[in-house]
């Protein structure tokens, strides 16, 4: 049974730095959580000093805890390769690593957003690594753009034909917005595979796993079904909230409904949060608006943070905490963490300042 964080520990800010067992600020940004063997494992991006620290110079860091408060440094779970022919080398971009456990293969499966070295954010790939143990080491398998040559399940035949090309449109114009919503970028990337940037993983009650990512130049989310071993894509996927411009997805299930909390597109700067709901993971998603309740500044910045993962606090899908990042792009290693209890007003997820936890 997962540990239940006492309510008093969520009653407001408790400082800035969150120290591990060595007295060092936890270095696991854009992270996610795995609960296995009565232990929480926190995986995240290992940042280094300065602006250059936003690149993957080290790898994915892992920490373990029995109570979500006191964290033990488990080291680097996935290291950058020393093989210069590998795609996963120091200086590339690796963001938002997430890990799930596969009961069939007994493997721990990590997916992450991967950009190639010296190519900015053009590659927009997702990477895969696997391990026999939760804290690693993880073996890098490959990176790809998924579902090449496959249309989404909810994409109409009438939209599959190219009618207008991107070069003919002014980015940001009403014509461009309509083109994007109709699937212009999806059609552009059809042959080579769909883009993957900010991402999340989710295991449903039937043990089927899904990969969600900001796709189509971050204009539209895709939810993609994974194979039984969680190491590939089945080809079944849907477009979610077309042209909704969502990043930082955190997805969870409560009382038979599926929810997500996301952010808008403002780079490293915080912005108003977003939320959405669906009756099924691959079904129609309905936008619910900004879940934040607080001052105008708090609501407009999601308490100066960006969502990354929703922690199931009781193992029953009844109580969740949103993990979020407070980015420091000028000195990446100094990024902070904000955890917010997710309340509900009927079917609407709510984030309140009095339920914010910022570390110890």
Predicted regions and their residues:
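Carbohydrate-active catalytic/glycan-binding domains of CAZyme proteins
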Residues: 3-360
């Amino acid at each position: 049974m997962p540990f239940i964080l006492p309510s008093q520990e969520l009653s407001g800010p408790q400082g800035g730095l969150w120290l591990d067992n060595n007295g060092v600020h936890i270095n696991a940004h854009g992270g996610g959580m795995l609960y296995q063997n009565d232990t929480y494992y926190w995986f995240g991006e290992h940042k280094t000093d300065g602006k250059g620290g936003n690149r993957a110079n080290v790898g994915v860091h892992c920490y373990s805890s029995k109570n979500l408060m006191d964290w033990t440094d488990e080291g680097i779970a996935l290291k950058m390769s020393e093989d210069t022919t590998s795609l996963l080398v120091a200086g590339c971009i690796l963001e938002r690593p997430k890990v799930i456990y596969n009961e069939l293969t007994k493997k721990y499966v990590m997916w992450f957003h991967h950009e190639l070295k010296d190519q900015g954010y053009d590659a927009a790939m997702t990477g895969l690594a696997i391990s026999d143990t939760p804290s690693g080491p993880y073996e890098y398998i490959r990176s790809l753009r998924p579902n090449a040559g496959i249309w989404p399940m909810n994409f109409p035949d009438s939209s599959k034909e190219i009618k207008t090309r991107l070069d003919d449109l002014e980015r940001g114009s009403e014509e461009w917005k309509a083109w994007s919503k109709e699937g212009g970028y999806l059609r552009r990337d059809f042959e080579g595979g769909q883009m993957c940037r900010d991402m999340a993983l989710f295991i449903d009650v039937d043990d089927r796993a899904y990969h969600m990512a900001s796709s189509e130049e971050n204009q539209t989310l895709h939810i993609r079904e994974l194979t039984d071993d969680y190491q590939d894509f089945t080809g079944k996927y849907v477009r979610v909230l077309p042209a909704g411009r969502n990043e930082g997805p955190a997805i969870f299930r409560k009382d038979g409904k599926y929810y997500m909390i996301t952010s808008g597109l403002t780079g490293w700067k915080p912005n108003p949060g977003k939320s959405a709901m669906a009756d099924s993971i691959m079904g129609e998603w309905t936008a619910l608006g900004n879940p934040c309740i607080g001052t105008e500044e708090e609501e407009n910045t999601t308490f100066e943070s960006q969502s990354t993962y929703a922690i199931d606090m009781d193992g029953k899908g009844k109580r969740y905490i949103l993990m979020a990042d407070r980015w420091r792009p000028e000195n990446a290693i100094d990024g902070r963490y904000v955890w917010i209890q997710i309340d509900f007003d009927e079917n609407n997820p709510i984030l309140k300042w009095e339920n914010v936890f910022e570390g110890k």
